[in-house]
Amino acid sequence: MSYVLALDQGTTSSRAMVFDAAGRVRSVARRDFTQSFPQPGWVEHDPAEILRSQFDCARDALADAGLRAGQLAAIGIANQRETTVLWERASGRALAPAIVWQDRRTAAKCAELRARGVWSEALRERTGLELDPYFSATKLAWLLDHVPDARRRAEAGELAFGTVDSWLVWHLSGGRLHVTDHGNAARTLLLDIHRRDWDDALLALFDIPRAVLPRLVDSIGVCGESDPAVLGAAVPIAGIAGDQQAATFGQHCFAPGMAKNTYGTGCFLLMNTGATPVKSSHRLLSTVGWTQGAAHTYALEGSIFMGGATVQWLRDGLGLIREAAEVEALAARVPDSGGVVLVPAFTGLGAPYWDAAARGALFGLTRGSGPAHIARAALDAIALQTDDLVRAMTADGAGPLHELRVDGGAAANNLLMQLQADMLGVAVVRPRMLETTALGAACLAGIGAGVWRDTDALAPHWQIDRVFTPAWSEDQRGAVRARWADAVARSRAWAA
């Protein structure tokens, strides 16, 4: 039997899972690692710790499955996106901590570029992205400017840049492969997503030398092999994708209009838009989903800052619950929020608003309002923010959405999933396997290595746990949306 090893390198932990040819999980391993916050707005990882945690997980997963690396048909990689690493080619040693996707240290640089008028609508359409510290370009420029002698060495070809997938593959291959897939590259602000190639004008804008960039490879397909010294055998590296692209693939969103939402600390909603990127008029992100030879799939993406983090605030900020899982029972004590509306703009609002000055607010409180109403309003807010994204995508010409596939920790909350179906007016489908990021990495690699012929062969691997069907009338839906829109408008620009 063939086996596939999926490496799932996330923001707070590294995971590894072994899948068999029937798509069954044979083992799971996880290692947490350290996040550092050296200054306000800065978030860093130790690149060496990322490697140790990920490769230790891989070895643990193989041992737990009772397998040797030589029995693997392929390795697939899914990774936290945008996080930026700069290393020395000769030694493989990182020259500085990795700058994490959440890091905001380059906000002033982005503001300066906007003020100079060099960021145009044409560049936004070329990249599919907003000019924001979230993405890799200004992070890399910061490293080149602040690590001693880095810019000269980068221009001389002595240094390598990569997102976390590149960093992992470099060391997994013993330094023989400096690559990234088109989907990860699309999150750097340096890729023309239409040509799927590095763009000279963007490199010039951010002052990035081409010599530091990785080679672009398909998301699906063998790009090289692991060094036998790492896992004990040379194994084809056959699939690479950013975590949200991998989750979309793992959710089998293979046709245009299909979408998934990951309910984690934040929420990430991706909709397959087919072979053509959609130009958003609602400040959504257009990105490369995955590529295989001449075939390429694009996606429209919206990000919500406060998903499960809203529930964490109920626990840590208000003390309404002791564990996050208790929110469902508390919210279920009341039939609705009793007119209470929570706008969880604690760190501003993400798509489609992109309002950094918005702030969290509770509206509609009366003497009769209690903890259950606030808990219900928190779940409503997660569902309503997702509804905002879906309606923006529809207005951009994507879709229409017929069902929403869900994953992530909060997808286990039945009340939230029912509220989501009611709010969207379409079925919400929860699969049995909620670890869809690792599953997606395995599926990409399995197709790339020939374990599975194509996406049709993956059909048995995605199975439904439960379908939540909408119960609200359109009038109910409209009334809730109107009240939400009023509350959001009141919370905006609060800190401006």
Swiss-Prot record:
Reactions accelerated catalytically: glycerol + ATP = sn-glycerol 3-phosphate + ADP + H(+)
Keyword set, alphabetical order: ATP-binding, Glycerol metabolism, Kinase, Nucleotide-binding, Transferase
Pathway: Polyol metabolism; glycerol degradation via glycerol kinase pathway; sn-glycerol 3-phosphate from glycerol: step 1/1
Gene Ontology biological-process entries: glycerol catabolic process; glycerol metabolic process; glycerol-3-phosphate metabolic process
Enzyme Commission number(s) from the entry: 2.7.1.30
GO cellular component: cytosol
PANTHER family assigned: GLYCEROL KINASE, SUGAR KINASE
Similarity annotation: Belongs to the FGGY kinase family.
Role, per record: Key enzyme in the regulation of glycerol uptake and metabolism. Catalyzes the phosphorylation of glycerol to yield sn-glycerol 3-phosphate.
The protein's name in its UniProt record: Glycerol kinase
Organism: Azoarcus sp. (strain BH72)
Gene (name only): glpK
